[in-house]
Amino acid sequence: MPDDLLLADAGLWRGDGAMLDPLTLRWRQAKDRPPAEARRVAAAEAAGWVLAKGRGRRLPAAIIGPRDPTPRALADAEAVARALALIGFPLICGGRGGAMEAASRGCTAVGGLMIGILPSDDWREANAHVAIPLATGIGEARNAVIATAAFALVSVGGREEPVSYGTISEMAFGLRHGRLVIGMAEAPDLPGVVRCASAEEAAARVAARYLALG
């Protein structure tokens, strides 16, 4: 699939001449060629432009991980959330403590929007960094809500003891519904998970999926 991206004030083009429809996030063959001032950009910059200036749909990405994370998982949660928020993605998490709080902290530190999908019926259970707490009252079934509401999920941990079966369920739901599921260093091993070594790599993968590039 062509992945050369050309950006101008008028829109975003792919190397094969297709232009992105920001509302449907689908590529359509353009009537006109990219203007002379169009410049080549990476997926992260292109996604940021679509989200901020191109009137694109603000699809949320999810950060998932355990309530009792290791220091590495905490660091990855904060770094990935920060990288995604800097592009302009609204984020979803479970809304409470552990990796969820670290992700919320990283997101809000750079002015991002964090949505917390809470299992209880009390929005006050959300950590202090959640901007929009959604009290579902559906218990662990909220894991399915997180996995299907996000177009991409990044798992930052859950493989180390104690194993996070909640995180595994979110990853499995995401894979079942065709979402991009990224695994950082300590994420559980599941078939279909895309492994990333850094927050920047994860953010680039999420941006490419948002732009329907892979």
Task: Name these PLM-found stretches.
Residues 32-38, 69-72, 121-128, 183-198:
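Generic structural signal for short, solvent-exposed loop/turn connectors between secondary structure elements
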Residues 3-114:
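Glycine-rich beta-alpha loop segments
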Residues 75-78, 82, 101, 144, ...:
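Amphipathic, non-transmembrane alpha-helical secondary structure
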Residues 78-79, 94, 98-177, 183-191:
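Acidic/glycine-enriched connector segments
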Residues 89, 108-112, 176, 207-212:
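Generic secondary-structure signature for well-ordered alpha-helical cores
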Residues 133-137, 193-212:
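Short acidic-hydrophobic, aromatic-tinged amphipathic segments that line or gate anion-handling sites
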